[in-house]
């Protein structure tokens, strides 16, 4: 796998995990159920598509500034993904930077979605984001047993909320992203 492919996979994985953490956080903190979580997800996907179009039109930095402008008082301090483990090598620091940038964008889009789909104001959005960080830290602890283990426990949380089986696809997994392998 090339470095560019690794970076892209890393960003995608971070985005997927933080979006799942956001949904779990909405359920944990406010009891938001399956139907309304579906509305939030649909609204977030629309925001993410808009962000992607803006990124292509004006570049990443301007698109991020526009997203921050839309968020305004909903999320004035943005979102900084906590490190699940201390980076040691330059590659680890770069990976953390990519994860943080992806998570910042995804959380921003989900925050806008919660505002639009659930009429959440700044207090509720910020409460959800704080709970999202807590859920992500919990996920980070789970990945100490390996990425698959962390994903499986996060999937269990989503199964509890959606009352439907969720499987973790590891068929294309070549190297860990959030934790260590068991071998």
Predicted regions and their residues:
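Intrinsic disorder/low-complexity detector
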Residues: 1-26, 50-116, 145-183
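Amphipathic alpha-helical segments that form the core helices of the histone-fold
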Residues: 40-51, 128-140
